[in-house]
A protein has these predicted regions:
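Nucleotide-sugar-dependent glycosyltransferase donor-binding/catalytic pocket residues
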Residues: 66-70, 98-101
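Conserved active-site helix of classical SDR/Rossmann-fold NAD(P)-dependent CH-OH oxidoreductases
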Residues: 36-43, 75-78, 106-107, 132
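Active-site beta-alpha turn of Rossmann-fold NAD(P)-dependent dehydrogenases/reductases
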Residues: 1-3, 57-59, 124
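Conserved sequence/active-site signature of Rossmann-fold short-chain dehydrogenase/reductase
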Residues: 5-6, 54, 61-63, 105
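Catalytic helix-loop patch of NAD(P)-dependent Rossmann-fold dehydrogenases
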Residues: 4-55, 69-70
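C-terminal substrate-binding subdomain of Rossmann-fold SDR/epimerase-dehydratase oxidoreductases
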Residues: 15, 60, 79-196
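Conserved catalytic/ATP-binding subdomain
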Residues: 71-72, 129
Length: 196
């Protein structure tokens, strides 16, 4: 699943017990509601048919193997910064996200798969950063002199996004290990190679 099930959250950080704040008819609604429906169907099969299931709510993830034209923030910041283009930040950039390096995500999913826990579990790095500061950090890692430009914030874009990983820590003994800056350095090396 995804952290998008929380929509534009009114509870911060978001625990698995929070049901979310989703605009079902907004431009993001189809994706958000599809994930919520998938979770409901998964739990129904688990309850009524005894199917062994796991639900991982993945928060913003980054790392090597991302597509250069992915459209998400880190690939966009990396690609624009490496090419010397203006780096696009939506809105004032004060909306927050918590980005998790891919190897940490994989470890969390692996531990969940090996567990017998069937309810949703948040897997993400709880260290929150504004999108503006994330763009600046990417440019710093790249040693890029690209300018940051602001564009209109898309409708229903969440103002905050931060996982409460208390449950993952308790039942999986999981905690992210890779520091954001270290992850960005590794990701930048990959993007430089892809764009050369």
């Amino acid at each position: 699943s995804t952290s998008e099930v929380y929509g534009d959250p009114e509870v911060h950080p978001q625990p698995e017990t929070y049901w979310g704040n989703v605009n079902p008819v907004g431009p993001r609604g189809v994706y958000d509601e599809a994930k919520r429906f998938a979770e409901a169907m998964t739990m129904a099969y688990h309850r009524y048919h005894g199917v062994e299931t796991r639900i991982v709510r993945i928060f913003n993830t980054y790392g090597e193997r991302m597509r250069v034209d992915d459209g998400r923030a880190i690939p966009a910041f990396m690609s624009q910064g490496i090419r010397g283009e203006d780096v696009t930040v939506f809105g004032n950039g004060l909306q927050t996200r918590s980005v998790c390096y891919v190897s940490d995500l994989v470890e969390g999913i692996y531990r969940l798969l090996l567990s017998d826990y069937s309810d949703p579990v948040n897997i993400g790095n709880p260290h929150e950063i504004t999108m503006l500061d994330l763009a600046k950090e990417v440019l710093e890692v790249l040693a890029s002199s690209s300018a940051i430009v602001h564009r209109e914030l898309p409708e229903d874009d969440p103002k905050v996004r931060q996982p409460d990983i208390t449950l993952a820590r308790r039942i999986l003994g999981w905690d992210p290990k890779v520091d954001r800056r270290e992850g960005l350095i590794r990701t930048a090396a990959y993007f430089r190679k892809k764009l050369s």
